[in-house]
Amino acid sequence: MAFTEANEREVQSSYEKENVKIIREEEAKDQESTDDIAVEDGTGTSPDLNFFSTQNVMQMNFEDEYSEFSNEDDEAEIDNSFADSIPNEPEIPDMQDEYSRDSHSQQSVEEQNNTTNTDEDASVNEFSVAADISDVNTLGKDNSESTEEPVNEVNETATLGNEDVGERSGFPSEGLDNEPESQRDLDETGNLAPEDLKDEVKSVHEFNEPNDLRQQEESYSDDDDTNVNEFEDVNEIENEHQLSVADEDQTSRLVKGKMIFVGKEDFGEEADISNSVFIEQNGPNSDTVSGFKETSSIVNSSSTTEKPGVALDSQNDTSIFNEEQTNSLTETFNDLTLDHLPENVESEPVAGKENETAKNESGASDNDHKANVHVFVLKSSEDAITLNEEKIATQDDPLEAPTPIVASSSTIFLNSNQRNDELSASGSQEPHPKDGTNSTSSLPLDTNNLSNSEPPSHVLDASSETIEVIQTIKKLQNQVPETIKDEVGKKNTAFSPGTSLSTNHVKTKSRSAHNNSTSPFSTAVSSWLNPLRYPSDKSPRVISSYLESVFISKPRSIGDAQKLEILEYLQSQSSTVSNQVFTLLSNFIQNPLFVLDECFDEFRNLILMHNSHTVHTVVWKTISSWTSYDYEMQYSSLSIKNCDSDKAIRKDLDRTFAPEILSHFFSNRQQLEPTDNIAESTANLHRVLRSLAIVLPQVGYTQGMSWIAGALLMHLPAPQAFALLVFLFKNYHLQNIFSSEMRGLSRVLHQFTRLVEDYMPSLAIHFKRQDIKTCSYASEWFLTLFAYKFPLEVVAHLYDILFLYGPGILFNFGLALLSHSQESLLKLNMDRLISYLKEDIFLAFKETQEGENYDTSLFVKTAFSFEIQPDVLDRYGNEYDILLKSEHELDSSLEEMRNRHKSLNEHFIMLSDSMANLQVEHENMSALLLKEKMYLKNQTVEQASLKSEIASLNSQLAKQKSEIEQAFQGDMEAIIAENLEIMVESQSLEDEIFRKEKQLAETKVNLAVLDEDHMMALQKWSQLMNRIKTK
């Protein structure tokens, strides 16, 4: 359907832009005069974009095709939603968003609807529709000819909505030519042939390429005959470029996700998307045109049906799904479980109207066209998740061997750094017990929200490998056959929370027939901690307990001699156990991993319910031999060495155990020799503790270790007791609670305190009011592993459970003690409360007040009634780490402030001394100043008197001068005259002296001449005499 120039002036600006874009494409490709004429007439259309706009669809006569809609409101609603029902409309994503932003859009639609009937005939004559409404709908039912065509490009445009809430989305699908129906190549069912459909899809994508966009921009610069003004053309090019970029981005995301989103056309900021659905193609032919048609036929039906998430046209001849497709979707949906869905996502079945004609004409087998479609109804905007295409395997399909699942253990005594070091040293992840020994949640406990797809964090640290394990679990669960998933609900209720202990249990079978047993104390978490087993030898090993995880993390084997030794002991004690227990223990000695994996239920029930001394010894001997045999060999050399802790060990042993208890520490009672005595038992215990201090020098010896070693020596020889003690410290991380600063113990006590607040808030408040700290009563529980007050026979039973479930079970033991005596504790005050917690709380589990036997089964049942989820333990542990870090920071700040205060105090003292000295000096200077001021005042008075005296003296002097001058004036004149005479006489005498001096000088000269002549005469004489003598 197209529009004339008269209609074009009435249509909104967005529709004019579309026509201009189509005209420019034809001009760029053909450059023919006929195209120029088409542009001038405004009737040029692209064969690929005949249904490009929803406005074209809205021009159809709805009264002819949908006669049941007579109400004007219904017609307006159809105008807004009918474009959604076109499954193959090749519209660029987000184009509807651009249209919705046009301020004249609503007005243009109303004008368009008013002129539909009058202009329909002329419009059909100029531009005929490629297919009517029924032909458009039948595109969703192409079953046979189109099943082998690839849809890589189709999937890119097969987006019927926008996954981003708050944005409107276009509804791309296959385009239809504007040729008459008689000229189109149609298959037998009346649908487009696969070749035509592929060509149309290709043309749509060619039109959306950036090169075509640049060509359109170039052609736009040469277009002088357009009937749209220049301003609108420029805006059209910019919008076209933005839409192309958005289209490429969205289609690339859809191709990666293999997903088709079906939803409402309008996604405003306040839009309700509760009826929107995701459709995931999981069938074997999901990459075909048929698969695309099947899924793209599901449309939103908010205006035509009341069922959310499903679009049905009950009055139209054509149906959205044929019978086979509907059955396929229904069966697929019924097979889905909530394990595949998040908590806030529900599944909705998809139904369609049967179409027998389309079914008979398709001629395709079920496997050629069926596609498993998952429909998830979104309940909130946060539920918009991408569903990756994964094939749901059937029972006959072998599963590919994934990476073995090794769940991490609840290392309750490890902080983040220690856990990283532990993982680095072991080179693998620490497994976690299948029965969820550490699962806990804050009250009230809501187990309905837990599912296999949402495993809890099972370690105490944010740096753990939880994310990797969760991803592996999710991947494997998506591959689990439906028949196997049905077996998840089978649970062993022998030790379920709230049930009484009994010997009834379901025997665990081989891997091919898995029975997901329930955790003895955590029903909610066991559904994840008990992973599914698979009917194939390639299935991963399933971690059933903490003990099994330890065996897996440190695989080794022992010699036949060690096995024979334990078997001989078991044989010697065969009278104390039943045949079934004897067989189970024999198998455990031969291969512990086999028993823990294949016979876990039987072994668990034996550990929880037995009261045989033989079971303790056999199980402990086996664990020691399989895990720590090297330490057994080293014991003889270590026990004779000296260490720094000898003195502390000897001092502690003398005050810890009674003599009758020490006599039991040399092996077990059946192995006592007549020569054994208390001294030898004490020395034996001393050697074990000393060897442990040598092996673990960073731990050394701490009070409480002797209780653990003593309990082990009750049932094991010293070498095996030492090896098992090292095993506990290294693999169960007890070395952290015995560290020098007891940081691990403080961390455990903090976690235990928070658990008491969760499960027994009234008791926690009572402790708070009575100022009872957890460390005042629970420290010895964890330091001695509850061996401090319980009889050692009961302690041995608790150690069996500890070995099986890991250190997390200690929290359950502590909660069991408090819970069983909660009413009594609430009635006691502070002094009596401390005494009760230290002494009498253990007596509450006695079978009778006068007897010595303890009801171990009641204690175990009470302990297993608490569901302690690991993520809560993680949170409490991390909470302590944060508090400890904050405390360290505060301590550092406090120490810095103390040092600062000390330096400032010293400076203050120095300044105070200086100030005192200056004060004394100031006082002295003040006294001196006062003295000087007085002296100055006296001097001023004296000066004034002296000045007056000077003045009088000066006047007297002047008077005396005048008198003297007058008295001696005549004498002076006589003296002056006499002086003149003397001066004249003196002058004459000086002249006489000058003449005499001159005469004397002349005489001296004459004398010199005479002396020279005399010398000459003497020389001559001498010469004469010499001559005379020579002659």
Curated annotation (Swiss-Prot):
Keywords from the named record: Cytoplasm, ER-Golgi transport, Exocytosis, GTPase activation, Membrane, Protein transport, Transmembrane, Transmembrane helix, Transport
Family annotation (SUPFAM superfamilies): Ypt/Rab-GAP domain of gyp1p
Principal location: membrane
Source organism of this protein record: Schizosaccharomyces pombe (strain 972 / ATCC 24843)
Organism lineage: Eukaryota, Fungi, Dikarya, Ascomycota, Taphrinomycotina
Family: Belongs to the GYP5 family.
Region feature (Disordered): 1-229, 278-317, 339-371, 420-459, 490-520
Flavoprotein found in the keyword field: no
Domain Rab-GAP TBC residues, every copy: 610-806
Descriptive protein name: GTPase activating protein Gyp51
Highest taxon of source: Eukaryota
MF-aspect GO terms: GTPase activator activity
GO biological process: endoplasmic reticulum to Golgi vesicle-mediated transport; exocytosis; protein transport
Compositionally biased spans, kind Acidic residues: 62-78, 219-229
Gene Ontology cellular-component terms listed: cytosol; Golgi-associated vesicle; plasma membrane
Described function: GTPase-activating protein involved in ER to Golgi trafficking and polarized exocytosis.
UniProt biased composition (Basic and acidic residues): 1-32, 195-217
Protein transport among keywords: yes
Localization of this protein: Membrane; Cytoplasm
